[in-house]
Amino acid sequence: GNTKYTAGAMRFAYENGDQLMSLLDKPNDKRIKDTDFGSYTQEKFETDLLNFNDGRPLSHEQKILVSKSLETIQWLSSHNVKFEPIYSRQSFLKDGKHIFWGGLTLASENEGVGLFDQELDAFLSLGGKIFYDSPVTNLIYEVGKVKGVYVNEEKVNADSVICASGGFEANDGLRKSYIGDNWINAKVRGTPHNTGDGLKMALEIGAVKHGLYNGCHATPMDLHMKNYGGLDLEPSERKNYRKICY
């Protein structure tokens, strides 16, 4: 997925710095005592989201994102997924104190790669299993219910299936279809594997489209920048390849 291509920063609502202490990988960092983390309330989080909604009210999913954000980050922390304050780009020094701004306070060490590694360790420690070279080619759909997946031609039954297969940013045709003709030329800064396969499989059995298919997060890029890549760069140099998502 795109996790490795991100900055590993986590946006979540919190009332004060005390709520952050249990989330930190290094709570004894000497800078902590001279740090003002401020607050990032649910109301502020909602306001920031509305600024990206182009006049639309908050969706049900956005409201859940806000209301469950602290609870979710605490759950990750309970499974040893830890974070560090983003001193380098989300704080400034004033009168001897590190003052945080913008609501983006914590990130994983080593950015998205570090976040991926921590989450993978947590998944495996909970008994999760990963099957490599096992592409899902179709959903098993019987009597109005998804009952598993086909891995190549092999049938794998399951009580439930989560299509955590990303969006369609790496699919030129779907970008053109949903976002516009010019988007066929867009540079893809994230993974080459998010080609919309999971979405297509779900739609083929009658799933209802949900969300803003004609919107995306994008940023100006060099015309000659290569598609994908960037994981071989140091985190501080990787910003040019942080993900573009749909």
Map each language-model feature to its residues.
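Glycine-rich loop(s) and the adjacent beta-strand/alpha-helix scaffold that form part
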Residues: V156-G229
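Conserved redox-cofactor binding core of oxidoreductases
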Residues: L58-E154, N171-L174, D222-H224
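Hydrophobic alpha-helical scaffolding
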Residues: T35, Q62, T105-N110, N185-P192, ...
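FAD cofactor-binding and catalytic pocket of flavoenzymes
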Residues: D34, M221-Y246
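Fold-independent oxyanion-binding glycine-rich loops
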Residues: A7, Y14, D133-P135, N152-E153, ...
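Conserved N-terminal glycine-rich FAD pyrophosphate-binding loop of Rossmann-like flavoproteins
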Residues: G1-N28, T219
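Dinucleotide-binding Rossmann-like beta1-alpha1 core, especially the glycine-rich loop
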Residues: E15-H79
